[in-house]
Amino acid sequence: MPHDLDTALAGISGILVTPYDDAGEIAPARLAPILDRALAAGVHMPVVNGNTGEFYALTTDEACTMVREVAALLDGRAPLLAGVGRGVRDACRLARASAEAGAAALMIHQPPDPFVSPRGTVDYVKAVIDAGGGLPVMLYLRNDAMGTQAIADLCALPGVKGVKWATPNPLKLAAAIDACDPGITWVCGLAEIWAPPLYAVGARGFTSGLINVWPERSAAIHAALARGDYTQANHLIAGMRPFEEIRAEEMNGTNVTVVKAALLTQGHDCGPTRPPSAWPLTDAQQARLDGFLAANELA
């Protein structure tokens, strides 16, 4: 089934968790009801091997399996965005596996290597694009310290369709948008809470981990922003802010923990998170999460 990739990129990029079984092995089949619920609510583009999917806790073999299995679960119902990254050879291998699985586009994680040069990043992205065999690419930018010109150089590479902007710097985003081809889609990579200020300078769409638990709220926020109703969007965001506040604790180390704990409360056992993510929630965190879920009739 054909899909409009540009429309999907400017929609909700729903970052799926990676479920584990009782032995700690990946269990992608457990995503089926979560994925079905997200699609029914209107999530535009599921994302596999993102940070909410504990990408850096997975082996490359596991990440390759996840993209194949999620593509099979999705079965063409929406375009699949597949995260790739780590060492360049791992990233290229995962790009090839993602293309073979039927992903619609690649999301290239910004290299976390301590010794990264802007021009080396260009070479890295070129290699991954080549390995992807022509799949469109979204760049995942979590650090804008490379500067506007370096960002523009990356966006000028053939195949780059969008940027997942995950830094809380709207003015730098505005400068980057001005410096790049107007055909590039700039997506808020900091979830629902940061969507309004980044929309104000030109971003469209946002990433979401909430979609695993409450996709209807994510869809309502996107709809409000799409019609320019910032008052309603902010009202809806206020209602889900406690969820994101708990996720941001412990240096963001409870980010995935909260999502998996909420899913467990909803009857979807996706296992624990892997270290170095925190597991389980503290009693105080769990009590706040339980209160949030109860207040919104989510459990």
Say what each PLM segment does.
Residues 58-61, 93-94, 118-121, 150-151, ...:
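Short secondary-structure transition/capping segments
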Residues 112-113, 159-160, 274:
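Glycine-rich phosphate-binding "P-loop"
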Residues 41, 65, 69-73, 97, ...:
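Alpha-helical structural signal in soluble globular domains
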Residues 11-17, 35-37, 41, 200-202, ...:
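C-terminal alpha-helical cap/extension of soluble enzyme domains
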Residues 2-145, 278-279:
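Active-site beta->alpha loop and helix N-cap motifs at the rims of alpha/beta catalytic domains
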Residues 31, 63, 67, 91, ...:
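A general structural signal for well-ordered alpha-helical segments in protein cores
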Residues 14-17, 27, 53-56, 86-88, ...:
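Short, flexible micro-motifs
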Residues 133, 142-244, 248-251:
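Catalytic alpha/beta core domains of metabolic enzymes, predominantly
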